[in-house]
Amino acid sequence: MPVLPDRDVIDQLFSGNSADPFSLLGMHAADNGLQVRALLPDASEVWLLEQQTGRRLVQLNCDDARGFFSATVPRRKTPFRYQFEVRWQDHQQIVDDPYRFGTLLQDIDSWLLAEGTHLRPYERLGAHLSTLDDVEGVSFAVWAPNAQRVSVVGEFNFWDGRRHPMRLRRENGIWELFLPGVKAGQLYKYEIIDCYGNTQLKADPYAFEAQMRPDTASLVTPLPEVVENTPQRQRANDFDRPISIYEVHLGSWRRHTDDNFWLSYGELAVQLIDYVKDMGFTHIELLPINEHPFDGSWGYQPLGLYAPTRRFGTPADFKDFVAAAHRAGINVILDWVPGHFPSDAYGLANFDGTALYEYADPREGFHQDWNTLIYNYGRHEVRNYLAGNALYWLERYGIDALRVDAVASMIYRDYSRAEGEWVPNYYGGNENLEAIAFLRYTNQSVGKERPGAVTLAEESTDYPGVTLPPESNGLGFHYKWNLGWMHDTLNYMQCDPVHRKYHHNQMTFGMLYAYTENFVLPISHDEVVHGKKSILDRMPGDAWQKFANLRAYYGFMWAHPGKKLLFMGCEFAQGREWNFDSSLDWHLLEGLDGWHHGVQRLVRDLNHCYQQQAPLYERDYRPDGFEWLVVDDHDNSVFAFARYDAHGNELIAVSNFTPVPRHHYRIGISRPGEYREILNTDSHHYHGSNTGNQGRVVSEQIGNHGREHSISVTVPPLATIYLLREAQ
């Protein structure tokens, strides 16, 4: 007869107070043979089978009506491979016992995970299709150090938390279990009895696929294969290359006209990628595509950091979308949100009954602006979770760059908080030293592990050294959004032209700090929502002037030092604000050729000109790549500057932000010669007035602006022109 455990030990197993079911269940050596114990609620009969032969060895006794069975295999001393033949109420089944398998995490993984230096924790945590002892199944692992019990529940066990309690690895707080027979595509969650005895159902933080709202389960999905980074894609991210970014919200770029439903990843891989290629953009930036519960967050409140949203298809479909962009020569940037997460009950919040992923003190852990929770960057395991996620997208999906959202909210403890609502750091300051250390660590990891991939920061303050390396006391980003330039120049453009002379410095101020960081000039989604109006509608004047102003502004922007970013719809001057719940206004491009077509053609030509003319990009971050020619003509609201490449090639941009054409306008130049007009935003081609310079101008030895030579040009009304110096 089998030796039964104490009744209270069995009770602990069923009540959820047993953190080590493996000490009780499975096969164990005993004086009289091998003891076999099984937890099979609702089973009526259980036999032990020899796996190799399928022979019945012994029937297990039902020692507890709740489903505890045991038996002794006499005269056997060495554990062997076995199975159970289980009779349920209406069918019979042969199953492998999950409690006959050993520990899953290797010692080195356990050490690195606890230390917070495991570069790829997603390779060990989560749900992984595995084969152990020639048995196929899934290895589950989840971090919940303060839980009393964790069970895997899903379609495969009737969502019954009694059936498959997990083993706790006390050295790192990770619960693990290999479940034979579980297959790809099956739904699962973790049933957690937390430190207070409350039962919670949690999605897997490391799930590679998740259900779309309103459903919340995780899906067993293979870990995507690594995507190699090509030299061409690495080179396209360099500081001396043209970078023109098309920012896109996949759910509202274009929709099916019959039912207003989203395009799939497959449809976007054709329609969107072809469009971006035709328009001349070099990069596409996706608003967050991590699984998220609330459409109105635009993806910026993700709960499935490792799972591409199923709104548009499967993870494999998304990977194909990225590959399609790469085949078209377009790099993919992903908006990444390591700053906060929503408090939905099935997610990370209060994961094991404690503030595990978030700061416990709401003065540190609650984000008042978004009603979300802030990651506890001081915990090794949280840093692992986030930094590993960055590498996951870069390596497993071939993403070329990550744009980190809301950096200022991460690095300042008093961000959007009044006095008394925040906790100073160890030194009494307002910097979140843990978040700063996390960002530096992540950026260093990206640089070492994925050469050629880059990170971009949306940082809204003047925090110093965002794009300096950590060893120079910087944050280690490659690029930073220049939000100051964007605000200043848009404020200028909103002024009536008659008043612009009083705001002249708003267009020039950006050059005073242009070389302090590696800047991207962003006209992003944030500028066309929440009552700010569309970019077109911000322009003053009648319809003709609005479009002319916008074209002139784009011309100025594309010539200005800094990489370019434009949100979808702005490239054809959509007239209304962006609405995440409907398609862009593509009907504006239907019918007869009009002003919207003109702006679209201009942006296309600007992008192609930008890529073809090295002076416009090669020395974006070097002072010798830029020279003001006309900087102080307030009265005429005219600006002129020269751009230079490494070989001395020169391109002059001249902008007139009044509706008055400037004929015979003389500009002092540094190098005499003949200049060809290669772009004019006032061209008939763009629905302008077609005022210009008949293709070229020639310098004269007439002093102006402190220079010996000058050119006399016609600067069209509300327009920007590009003049390329011909080779001599």
Curated annotation (Swiss-Prot):
Gene Ontology cellular component list: cytosol
InterPro entries: A-amylase/branching_C, Branching_enzy, GlgB, GlgB_N, GlgB_N_E_set_prok, Glyco_hydro_13_cat_dom, Glyco_hydro_13_N, Glyco_hydro_b
UniProt keywords, alphabetically: Carbohydrate metabolism, Glycogen biosynthesis, Glycogen metabolism, Glycosyltransferase, Transferase
EC top class, as a word: transferase
A UniProt-annotated Pfam family: CBM_48
E.C. code: 2.4.1.18
Pathway: Glycan biosynthesis; glycogen biosynthesis
Coiled-coil region: none
GO biological process: one example: glycogen biosynthetic process
Keyword S-adenosyl-L-methionine: no
Active site: D405 (nucleophile), E458 (proton donor)
Molecular function terms, GO-annotated: 1,4-alpha-glucan branching enzyme activity; cation binding; hydrolase activity, hydrolyzing O-glycosyl compounds
Catalytic reaction(s) noted: Transfers a segment of a (1->4)-alpha-D-glucan chain to a primary hydroxy group in a similar glucan chain
Family: Belongs to the glycosyl hydrolase 13 family. GlgB subfamily.
Assembly and binders: Monomer.
Task of the protein: Catalyzes the formation of the alpha-1,6-glucosidic linkages in glycogen by scission of a 1,4-alpha-linked oligosaccharide from growing alpha-1,4-glucan chains and the subsequent attachment of the oligosaccharide to the alpha-1,6 position.
Name of the protein: 1,4-alpha-glucan branching enzyme GlgB
